[in-house]
Amino acid sequence: KQRNMSERDFDWLSRMWSKKLYKSQKEHYFGKLFSASANMPSFQSYFPEGKVLYMVRDPLQVIPSGLSLVTGVLDKKFGFWNQPDDLRKRYLLRLYNALKELLIRFHEDWINENIKKSKVKIVTFNRLMGNFDNLMFEILEFLEIEKSEEIEKLILETAEKQKAFKSNHKYDLEKFGLTEEQIKNDCQNIYSTFLSGDF
């Protein structure tokens, strides 16, 4: 049986964000959440005025990155890669399925109109890297934040640096018991809906 702890989690987030806003005397708070995407309808119901920037990146980059991050922490603490082979394989499969589930749940809610799309902006990683300035101006408009000269200058400077950025991360899918074909097949709906050029 799956436990739904979203109400408890949203209560906690609400308290934390309220404290941060009070202390900073700011009007808005920007949170970076990894798990809200798996339960976006409930999140929007609890925070009806909230706006969401949902980052979409190629699952061939996202999933190995998540696997590498989690197993790296586990290896430092528990020597993950020295554990018995069957234990590692079982854990990696479960972790892969969980990371995949985060993507698929949001996609299912999106295509089934369970998400208030007017409150969500889809941001693709490719646009973030290749068209940073225009994307940022769109985001400011979406968030109803006034574009000051200072913000515009900062965005244009960052856009120039962004063009030269190259990620040094290389992931060995075989290490995680995966293949490129498997990820593409499992996440084919993510590609067709969000990564086909419409966003």
Across the structure, where does each feature detected by a protein language model lie?
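Short His-Asn-centered micro-motif
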Residues: F30-F34, V56, F125
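Flexible, glycine/threonine-enriched loop-and-boundary segments that flank and lead into catalytic domains
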Residues: K20-E49
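Short catalytic/ligand-binding loop motif for oxyanion handling, primarily in non-cytosolic enzymes
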Residues: A38-N39, Q61-S65, M129-F132
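Hydrophobic alpha-helical segments and helix-packing faces
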Residues: A36, M55, P59, L99-L102, ...
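Conserved phosphate-donor/acceptor-positioning beta-strand/loop module used by diverse small-molecule
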Residues: S42-S68
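PAPS-dependent sulfotransferases, especially Golgi type II membrane carbohydrate sulfotransferases
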Residues: K1-F10, L21, H28-Y29, L67-I122, ...
